[in-house]
Amino acid sequence: MREFGKSRKLDNVLYDVRGPVVDEAARMEENGTNVLKLNIGNPAPFGFRTPDEVIYDMSRQLTDCEGYSNSKGLFSARKAIMQYAQLKKLPNVTVEDIYTGNGVSELINLSMSALLDNGDEVLVPAPDYPLWTACVTLAGGTAVHYICDEQSEWYPDIEDIKKKITDKTKAIVIINPNNPTGALYPREVLQQIVDVAREHELMIVSDEIYDRLVMDDYEHVSIASLAPDLFCVTFSGLSKSHMIAGYRIGWMVLSGNKALGKDYIEGLNMLSNMRLCSNVPAQSIVQTALGGYQSVGEYIVPGGRIYEQREYVYKALNDIPGISAVKPKAAFYIFPKIDTARFNITNDEQFALDLLREKKILIIHGGGFNWDKPDHFRVVYLPRTEILKDATGKLADFLASYKQK
């Protein structure tokens, strides 16, 4: 009988945030082992709750959400997103430039599928959120990784970006605030990226899902606000800021010189129509979520959970011999560096597996974020401080005698 294998289009597609190490953790859990999951930015399991007003409004509107919406989304949702984009100073945005999706993830896939021909190149940061590289690859393109510099607060290396541009380069992706590093890019760095994009006629694609999770009174600047003459695509959503990752509601905003993307927009509309619409109940709460009280603000100031957990994990990790980390300014991730010579580490995935098996702690190795050296890993600091204290204590104990074989 004929056997059925996976498509060859998936041969070079990786997504290790839910990959082999996570699969091993699942097997351990099936056998009754309690695993502490520091691998994925899912707020709900760690006690973060959706604002009551949002839940109430959804429940009141459920009977009105039984049919399809416009393929781009409900007018009320898109109007609220448009107004939010205007507050962020995105230029030349109308309701028709807004696309809702089942989370930003769906829209990343849609946006790359509409853009890329086989062999086209997209500049993607390293480290990155791996879905970007996966979706570029799946669409037939090539993700060309530019370095973000740990010695410079994990900001993009502008000279490296310039070196990576070829006549096949179509777009540059930035992730700001950044996952996995927690970096926040200042206006000056963003302006340099805009200048490069302008010189080389690149589309700017910006993932800004963590833009409302910025700490220490820093300002988040949308790169599209600096590029009215370029064609920009900006992504955000409610999964992180409103702690509703399971509701699956994100959006994509087109801005700037949209005449440059006229044919591309036709492709976006075609793909948007093909999936009919994003889930309507989640769309129904966008207006309330964006227009109402922003409870996330309580988490990211001194005394707030995310702020205090960041403070703890940053110090605790840096106190472990052989570990160093740059302090995150946003989101809820930290990307520590490990002294590979000290621990004889040549395979970071094996390091993550060894930690999982010995200490029952699940982290994602740096290679899962397209970082090409075996010297980093990502920690999610959503668990309460007492849990993080237990986790960092176990990590310190593990490393006290660890030598990779």
Which positions does each model-derived feature cover?
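Conserved core segment of the aminotransferase class I/II
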Residues: S225-G304, Y314-A316, L399-A400
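PLP-dependent enzyme catalytic core of the Aspartate aminotransferase-like
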Residues: L87, K163, N344-T346, D354-I363, ...
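Conserved glycine-rich beta-strand-loop-beta hairpin in the small C-terminal domain of fold type I
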Residues: Q287, G303-Y314, A325-D339
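Helix C-cap/helix->beta junction micro-motif
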Residues: N31, A139, E199-H200, L230, ...
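A short helix-loop-beta submotif of the ANL/AMP-binding
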Residues: T137-V144
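N-terminal small-domain helix-loop-helix segment of the aminotransferase-like
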Residues: R2-K6, D11-G103, L110, C277, ...
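Conserved PLP-anchoring active-site segment centered on the Schiff-base-forming lysine
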Residues: A114-V136
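Active-site phosphate-binding strand-loop segment of PLP-dependent enzymes
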Residues: V144, D149-H220
